[in-house]
Every structure is written in structure tokens, then in C-alpha cells.
UniProtKB/Swiss-Prot annotation:
GO molecular function, one term: metal ion binding
Metal-binding found in the keyword field: yes
Organism: Microcystis aeruginosa (strain NIES-843 / IAM M-2473)
EC number(s) reported in the record: 4.98.1.1
Gene that this sequence comes from: hemH
Keyword annotations from UniProtKB, A to Z: Cytoplasm, Heme biosynthesis, Iron, Lyase, Metal-binding, Porphyrin biosynthesis
Enzymatic class: lyase
UniProt protein name: Ferrochelatase
Database matches in InterPro entries: Ferrochelatase, Ferrochelatase_AS, Ferrochelatase_C, Ferrochelatase_N
Keyword Secreted tagged: no
Role summary: Catalyzes the ferrous insertion into protoporphyrin IX.
């Protein structure tokens, strides 16, 4: 088989306040995050949004110590995984590839090539698949494989999602159970699953399986937990005026407060590491929302980080993938004839040349409107909070 490697994929995060703006630029330059009809507008718009959002985002990172802990945690996960695989008799080198910040996926691939890895397991640290997370990283990797003759000789296999893996579910249930045991009336605590949201159109138009996998994962965790607690699933981190998956976390918290819920245990279901969405958005912003809604006790389950059962689940996934038939990019990109993985492959802006021309004109008008709004400081985007 030759030398074996595991590539862990994740989002990445700014480690210093001065990294925030370029990180946001990389994020909003991704067509899986913001899709435009004219590719030439992608980076100018990313520059505008990152410039306008940098100050607020820096303040959020300042509240959690001045930077994201994501890389350090991912490095610890990689070390623990490599050690566990060694204990299982597998000599494997583990690499980290971040989508929007250092170390970038491209850097990881260069290290993999230098180490002469002959077989690579590509493992996203996203339990549930989405075109905006695992899908975006897969797109980058697929392009690299197509363009690099050396990589085309490297055997690889993908692990698209693992939200239903029994050991992962046990790790999540264990974290929840530990928090419940600290409560005076554990069976009366309302369990609140908060997942990162995606635009509704990803699910309805592009066929993204993310919502289905999140819902199935939530039910599976509750079955594994095997407790009588009531629970709610909601979606956080909405950006912009478009419809995202509902219910929104903020709205769901207010509704639970109106129902008289007093003790809430929040479970970050789509995050395996502590980062800005858990440490600032949940712990600070949503805590304030809950308290204002009348919820008196607000607890959060910690992220999995290097939980032994979580590392065990990753090692089991790697070993299983090495023993099975490889899963390729083509299998993920084209799961069925009428559905593509990437939204720019699936969504069409017009059926005729004339329609496409009008789409371009409308895009330019919209772009000019943004410029005018930036100059005046007033307009609909300021009203909805996007700018």
C-alpha cells in the first residue's frame, strides 16, 4: 500500500485580530458561500464585505481572547488520532488542511507530496455534509487532482459524512450526560441543539443533504442518550437577508422563554471544536438572548475537541475507509443525474442568452447600489444588518 496519510479538513480561523479581515475575504471569496452570476464580481464583493465586517468581527474575537483556538485544537486532534491509529497497528501520518486560513488545504497537499504519501484518507471534521463546508473543500481538492499529474497517481478515498457513526454518537451523548448530571433536576432540563445554518436554497434548490443529516443526527443522539428530556433543534449564524434554515436559534430561545422553560442545556451539534460560534455566539450572544427571554439557567455542552470516544470514532472511520472500496470525488459530485454537489453547477440564472444578459445587467446595478450605500451609509443592506 505504501505510506498512508490522513488529511483532516476544517474551516480555519484567524489566530490574531489582524488576521480577521483577510480571513473574511477568503471566506466570502468562496462561491459556495456567496454565489454571483458574474465571477468577476466575487472578489470585489468579498473585499467590500470583509472590509465592512472586519471591525465587528474583531470585537467578537477580542471577546474570546483575540483569536480563534481552532488550529490548536485541530492540531491536538491530529496528534491524538495519529497516536490512536499507531496503537491500532496503523502507521499513518495526519495532516491538517484549512479552507480559509493557515495552514491552507493547498499547503497540506504540498506536504503530503513531499512525504511521498501513496494512499490518502480525506476526512472532513464536519459530521454532516454540506456543499458549503465539506463540499467546498472537496471542490478545491478535486481541481488539484485534475491539474496535478502526481496527485492523479495518489490513491485516495473520501469520508463524506459520519453523523450517524455509533462511537461519535456515544461521545456526544456522554458530553450531554455529564452536563445533565450537574443539574439538580436533570430530567427537567430542556436540551437545545444549535447547528450552523445554511441558506434554505441550498437544500431546496441544490439538494444539499445537510438539513436531513442534522435532523437525523439529533434524533440519533437523543436515542443514544436514552433520557426523557424534551429537546429543540435550531440553526444559528445566519448572515444577510435571505432565508436560512429555520427555526433560527435566537427565535427558538425566545419561544422557549415564552413557554416557561427555565433550565436550558445547549448542544453545539455541528461543531467538533471550540471556536467563535461556540465561545462567542453561543456563550455570549445567545446567553443574553436566553436570559432576556426568562431562561434562568443557561448551560452549554463543550465541543468534542479531543474527547477519547471522539478520537476513537475518527480512528474507526479511517481504518474502515482503508479496508473498503475508495470513495472518489466523482461519486460525491454526481450522486444522481439531476443533482450536483456544487450550487454553481446546479442553479441556473436564465434559460436564454437574453436572460443571461439581463442577469448580468441586474448584477451590475446591484453592485453599483452597494457602492452608493457604502458612500451614503444608508440603505436596505444596513437596515437588515448585512453592511
Amino acid at each position: 500500500m505504501g505510506r498512508v496519510g490522513v488529511l483532516l479538513l476544517n474551516l480555519g480561523g484567524p489566530e490574531r485580530l489582524e488576521d480577521v479581515r483577510p480571513f473574511l475575504f477568503n471566506l466570502f471569496s468562496d462561491p459556495e458561500i456567496i454565489r454571483l452570476p458574474i465571477k468577476g464580481l466575487q472578489k470585489p464583493l468579498a473585499w467590500l464585505i470583509s472590509t465592512l465586517r472586519a471591525s465587528k468581527s474583531q470585537e467578537n474575537y477580542r471577546q474570546i481572547g483575540g483569536g480563534s483556538p481552532l488550529l490548536k485544537i485541530t492540531e491536538a486532534q491530529a496528534t491524538a488520532l495519529q497516536q490512536r491509529l499507531k496503537e491500532m497497528g496503523r502507521e499513518v501520518s495526519v495532516y491538517i488542511g484549512m479552507r480559509y486560513w493557515n495552514p491552507f488545504t493547498e499547503e497540506a497537499i504540498e506536504r503530503i507530496k513531499r512525504d511521498h504519501i501513496k494512499k490518502l484518507v480525506i476526512l472532513p471534521l464536519y459530521p454532516q455534509f454540506s456543499i458549503s463546508t465539506s463540499g467546498s473543500s472537496f471542490r478545491v481538492l478535486e481541481e488539484m487532482w485534475q491539474q496535478d499529474p502526481y496527485l492523479r497517481l495518489t490513491e485516495y478515498t473520501l469520508i463524506p459524512s459520519w453523523y450517524d457513526h455509533p462511537t461519535y454518537l456515544s461521545a456526544m451523548a456522554d458530553l450531554i450526560a455529564r452536563e445533565l448530571e450537574q443539574c439538580p433536576n436533570p430530567d427537567q432540563v430542556h436540551i437545545f441543539f444549535s447547528a450552523h445554518g445554511v441558506p434554505q436554497s441550498y437544500v431546496e434548490e441544490a439538494g444539499d443533504p445537510y438539513q436531513r443529516q442534522i435532523e437525523e443526527c439529533t434524533r440519533a443522539i437523543m436515542r443514544t442518550l436514552n433520557r426523557p428530556n424534551q429537546y429543540t433543534l435550531a440553526y444559528q449564524s445566519r448572515v444577510g437577508p435571505v432565508e436560512w434554515l429555520k427555526p433560527y436559534t435566537e427565535d427558538a430561545l425566545k419561544e422557549l422563554g415564552e413557554q416557561g422553560i427555565k433550565h436550558l442545556l445547549v448542544v453545539p451539534i455541528s461543531f467538533v471544536s471550540e471556536h467563535i460560534e461556540t465561545l462567542q455566539e453561543i456563550d455570549i450572544e445567545y446567553r443574553e438572548v436566553a436570559e432576556e427571554a426568562g431562561i434562568e439557567h443557561f448551560q452549554r455542552v463543550p465541543a468534542l475537541n479531543t474527547h477519547p470516544m471522539f478520537i476513537e470514532s475518527l480512528s474507526q472511520l479511517v481504518v474502515k475507509s482503508l479496508e473498503e472500496k475508495p470513495t472518489t470525488f466523482e461519486q460525491i459530485t454526481h450522486p444522481k443525474a439531476n443533482m450536483k454537489m456544487y450550487p454553481q453547477e446546479r442553479w441556473e440564472w436564465g434559460m436564454t442568452t437574453a436572460a443571461e444578459v439581463w442577469n448580468g445587467r441586474l448584477a451590475m446595478i446591484g453592485f453599483l447600489a452597494i457602492i452608493i450605500e457604502l458612500i451614503t451609509g444608508q440603505g436596505p443592506l444596513h437596515f437588515v444588518g448585512l453592511l
